[in-house]
Amino acid sequence: MKVILKTNNLCKDFKKQKAVNNVSITVRENSIYGLLGPNGAGKSTTLKMFTGMLRPTSGKVLFNGHEWNRKDLEQIGALIETPPLYENLSAVENLEVRAKLLNIPKNRIDQVLKIVDLQNTGRKKAGQFSMGMKQRLGIAIALLNNPKLLILDEPTNGLD
């Protein structure tokens, strides 16, 4: 199978604290990988480097055989830690913002809302959602672009 993500000696320091130290991983298409470790082990930090949310102190992140760049976000879906929601917008409106930015057809919004069982939330604002509903909306956002690489950090947090 084709390699979709590869890291070489990935490191991340915050001041004098080493959060990630020499992580090398190869992720193949159509595979499921998990990062295991105690709190503070650097799992979320590593995932943030995979998506460009953090820059490595040293090392490289390769996506589809080339060094990661912003254009790759069109093919990556992610939910890391807290869902990135506009609390004053409905589920549909939250997805419409992203669909417009990524040139995704509006019918995809209905598809992902059905996948996460949020198709009947109407005009209710995301800020009024339960924690589980917010998490499901975050998963819908991650799935919206039908990503080649899907990164989920504790995706079952708060699910009802």
Language-model features: where?
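Conserved ABC ATPase "signature" region
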Residues: 96, 100, 106-121
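Helix-to-loop junction immediately C-terminal to a conserved catalytic motif
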Residues: 51
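Catalytic Walker B motif of ABC-type/P-loop ATPase nucleotide-binding domains
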Residues: 150-154
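Hydrophobic anchor residue at the start of the ABC signature
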Residues: 139
